[in-house]
């Protein structure tokens, strides 16, 4: 009888050990699913190419009409807003060309009855000289113009003085005089019509025409 109690006690100890062994093991935590990648952006390359091409067409038209400043600004817009397009790839060279033509053909203006070079005109002529040093085969005709006040003969002479003043300034910057030709038109070719101070101011000028060389 004592042996049976001992056997029961032996069985009871493991059962108590199992019952008191602590909390059950926690279930493994399932990892959260990885976030899905966003869908790729729609392919708008054709639209970007078309938009850039339209701006380039406007730039080409501006170049053809001699509005080099507008052409340059349009090409810079393409380079800024539509990088990677065919038009943007070609833009840097065309911008350089437009900038050179803009400098070479920029006109200068004079005060009433004067042929002296103002500070503003000097800055324009200095940029012109830089372009001429880069494009060594370019030659220019310098035209002198006047407003309508004064006699025809007087304005012819004043126009020539203005053209020669521009020539003298350019040669003082080290450019060869053989690259230039001077001519006067007096009051015969006004830039602006009308007998107002604004029109007269625009007409007192020297124009620069490219007569040889490629840009």
For the regions a protein language model found, what residue spans apply to each?
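Periplasmic OmpA-like peptidoglycan-binding domain that tethers envelope proteins to the cell wall
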Residues: 143-215
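Short, conserved catalytic or interaction motifs in soluble domains
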Residues: 22
């Amino acid at each position: 009888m004592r042996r049976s109690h001992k056997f029961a006690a032996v069985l009871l100890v493991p059962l108590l050990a199992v019952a008191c062994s602590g909390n059950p093991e926690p279930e493994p935590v399932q990892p959260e699913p990885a976030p899905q990648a966003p869908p790729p952006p729609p392919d708008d390359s054709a639209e970007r190419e078309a938009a850039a091409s339209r701006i380039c067409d406007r730039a080409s038209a501006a170049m053809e009409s001699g509005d080099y400043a507008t052409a340059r600004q349009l090409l810079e817009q393409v380079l800024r807003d539509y990088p990677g397009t065919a038009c943007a790839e070609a833009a840097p060279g065309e911008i350089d060309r437009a900038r050179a033509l803009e400098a070479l053909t920029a006109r200068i203006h004079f005060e009433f009855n004067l042929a002296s070079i103002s500070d503003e005109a000097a800055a324009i002529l200095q940029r012109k000289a830089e372009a001429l040093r880069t494009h060594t085969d370019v030659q220019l005709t310098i035209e002198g113009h006047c407003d309508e006040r004064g006699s025809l003969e007087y304005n012819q002479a004043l126009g020539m003085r203005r053209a020669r003043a521009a020539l003298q300034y350019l040669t003082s910057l080290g450019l060869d005089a053989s690259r230039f030709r001077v001519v006067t038109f007096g009051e015969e070719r006004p830039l602006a019509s009308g007998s107002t101070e604004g029109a007269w101011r625009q007409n007192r000028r020297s124009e620069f025409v490219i007569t040889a060389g490629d840009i």
